[in-house]
Design a protein with these regions (language model features):
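N-terminal membrane-targeting hydrophobic helices
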Residues: 1-214
Length: 214
């Protein structure tokens, strides 16, 4: 899952209005933000296998430290503790968002999501069908966008256009990821992931800066 995680990040603004959208996105996508660094370091492995599933050409060979249920619970507690003073609900919301990544990925992934490092792997395999994946992910994303729009108000043109450009831009990025060719190399995967997520975090911070919680 990709864009559905951002949907939860958007929606979480209602529960923790004092937390920047960038931090909520970081929490919801913490697993995928950490993963490219671990791939670059050789700690986790991925293989390019066109046709591996209908949705992605990537075969996630091993990612126990970024994507296992146990480790995401640990990362969630640590990240929530780091931002606990930002908002009275920050700890609980951020920790839950980090852990939610595993729950959502289990729905879409084939059985490659570890329960703990070295443990059994699970997955319901929705990625075997592009239409079914879209039927789950897109409503989740649009619901999150709608909740964020109702929970905040734009301050001037920047507030309105920043938010619009963010949610439309993420949607277009999702479409490009699905329709585009497989990545040319493992290096392209982790480098693109690092740069891409950094850009999204900066973009979401800027857009949210001109919104007021209501």
């Amino acid at each position: 899952m990709f864009i559905g995680h951002f949907g939860l990040g958007f929606a979480a603004k209602r529960a923790a209005p004092g937390v920047s959208l960038a931090i909520l996105f970081l929490a919801a996508q913490f697993a995928d933000t950490l993963w490219p660094f671990l791939v670059a370091a050789g700690v986790e492995q991925v293989r390019i296998d066109p046709g591996h599933t209908a949705v992605t050409p990537l075969d996630f060979v091993s990612y126990p430290w970024s994507h296992s249920l146990l480790m995401l619970a640990v990362w969630g507690v640590l990240l929530g503790w780091m931002f606990r003073t930002v908002d009275r609900r920050a700890f609980a919301v951020i920790a839950a968002l980090v852990l939610s990544h595993w729950v959502l990925d289990v729905v879409t992934h084939i059985p490659d999501m570890p329960l703990y490092p070295g443990g059994p792997r699970v997955g319901l395999g929705l990625w075997r069908s592009m239409p079914l994946t879209a039927a789950v992910e897109l409503p989740l994303y649009f619901a999150g966008v709608w909740i964020y729009a109702r929970a905040t108000r734009g301050r001037g043109t920047k507030g309105r256009l920043g938010f619009a450009s963010l949610w439309i831009g993420l949607l277009l990025l999702h479409v490009v990821n699905l329709a585009g060719p497989p990545p040319p190399s493992i290096t392209a995967i982790w480098a693109g992931g690092i740069v891409g997520f950094a850009a999204i975090m900066a973009w979401s911070w800027w857009a949210d800066r001109y919104r007021t919680a209501i």
